[in-house]
Regions:
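Extreme N-terminal tail/first-helix region
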Residues: 1-13
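Helix-adjacent hinge/juxtasegments
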Residues: 60-94
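Proline-centered turn/helix-capping motifs that create local helix->coil transitions or kinks
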Residues: 99-108
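Conserved acidic
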Residues: 6, 43, 80-83, 87, ...
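Short, contiguous alpha-helical
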Residues: 11-15, 19-22, 30-74, 113-169
Length: 169
C-alpha cells in the first residue's frame, strides 16, 4: 500500500540523517569509532547507537507498541564497526513497519511523550519540545531534528578522529 506522502517524507528524512551517522563510521576501525573528542564526549558508535535507539523508541511507541529501550546502555557503545550497519538496517525496518501503521489522522492526534527508557536514567535526557500538548507529528519531527543534530555531530567527530587516530598509525 505504501506510506502517505507526509509519512514517506518523514521516513526519508529520518533515514537520511541516520544514514549520515552510519556513513561517518565507514572505513574506520573499532578503536576509531570508540574514540571520544573529550572525556565526557560521545564517540561515533555511541552517536549511532543512541540516535537509532531514540528514533526507534519514539516511532514504535507512537503506534502503541512497547519499547524495551535502555537509553543508558546506548552510551556504553554496545555495537562494533562490523555490527553497526546490520543493527541500523534492522532498526530502520522496524521503524518503517511502525510508520506503516500511522496515517494523517493519527499524526494529528495528541500523544503522551514516548517513555525514554525502561529504567531510571543515569545519563540525563534533554528534550527540546516546548510545554503543552504534542501530536504524533510533533514527536516525529523531533526525532528528525534529533537525528540531524547528531548527524552533524558525527561528521565533525569523524573528521576529528581521522586527525587524532589516523588508520594504520
Amino acid at each position: 500500500m505504501g506510506l502517505a506522502p507526509e509519512l514517506e517524507s518523514i521516513r526519508r528524512r529520518l533515514f537520511r540523517d541516520i544514514d549520515r551517522i552510519a556513513e561517518a563510521l565507514d572505513g574506520l576501525d573499532d578503536e576509531q569509532i570508540a574514540w571520544k573528542p573529550l572525556a565526557t564526549g560521545s564517540s561515533l558508535i555511541v552517536l549511532i547507537t543512541h540516535v537509532v535507539g531514540s528514533a526507534q523508541n519514539t516511532v514504535v511507541q507512537l503506534v502503541g507498541d512497547e519499547s524495551s529501550r535502555d537509553r543508558d546502555s546506548e552510551f556504553l557503545a554496545p555495537w562494533t564497526a562490523q555490527s553497526a550497519r546490520s543493527e541500523v538496517e534492522a532498526a530502520k525496518a522496524r521503524i518503517s513497519a511502525a510508520l506503516e501503521r500511522l496515517d494523517a489522522r493519527t499524526l494529528d492526534a495528541e500523544h503522551a511523550p514516548p517513555r525514554v527508557s525502561s529504567r531510571p536514567l543515569t545519563v540525563p535526557s534533554v528534550s527540546t519540545l516546548s510545554a503543552g500538548p504534542k501530536t504524533s507529528r510533533d514527536f516525529l519531527l523531533q526525532a528528525i531534528a534529533h537525528a540531524a543534530e547528531h548527524a552533524g555531530h558525527a561528521e565533525l567527530t569523524r573528521d576529528l578522529v581521522r586527525a587524532a587516530l589516523p588508520k594504520g598509525s
